[in-house]
């Protein structure tokens, strides 16, 4: 094993901790992004509860090996930054795709979802998946729809009776 200085070992430990504890993580290249745009992107991510960290590839490689992930070797080439969340597993993927549209120069290198390596191609596909809240809303709609239909069907005869009685009342009032 390569000998690593204590301060760098601390960085490797921090990276390993982020990888272990994050619900979702995207690795990306930010080559061509201005420092002003990088600061704006970090602020935007922070507002959304995400963290962006620029990392050294050699230290990232050590952390990934310690975790035991089989990743694409291209991850360790060029500039690398991490985007991760400890709360929502899909948020890093969705917000990364938004940032790609906004800045254009960002390129996905891959990601981690539920402890599994995600290729760069899969990052876009995962970003299109509905989030937890959207799935809950869809489930509520699916469950409540038959009940609403049943209520409508059962209340139909009573509603018709009320209309008939109203018509009789109006007819008697006109006759009187």
Swiss-Prot record:
Coiled coil: none annotated. Keywords: Ribonucleoprotein, Ribosomal protein, RNA-binding, rRNA-binding. GO terms for cellular component: ribonucleoprotein complex; ribosome. GO terms for molecular function: large ribosomal subunit rRNA binding. One of its GO terms (biological process) is translation. Belongs to the universal ribosomal protein uL10 family. Forms part of the ribosomal stalk, playing a central role in the interaction of the ribosome with GTP-bound translation factors. Part of the ribosomal stalk of the 50S ribosomal subunit. The N-terminus interacts with L11 and the large rRNA to form the base of the stalk. The C-terminus forms an elongated spine to which L12 dimers bind in a sequential fashion forming a multimeric L10(L12)X complex. HAMAP family: Ribosomal_uL10. This is Large ribosomal subunit protein uL10. It comes from Coprothermobacter proteolyticus (strain ATCC 35245 / DSM 5265 / OCM 4 / BT). The gene is rplJ.
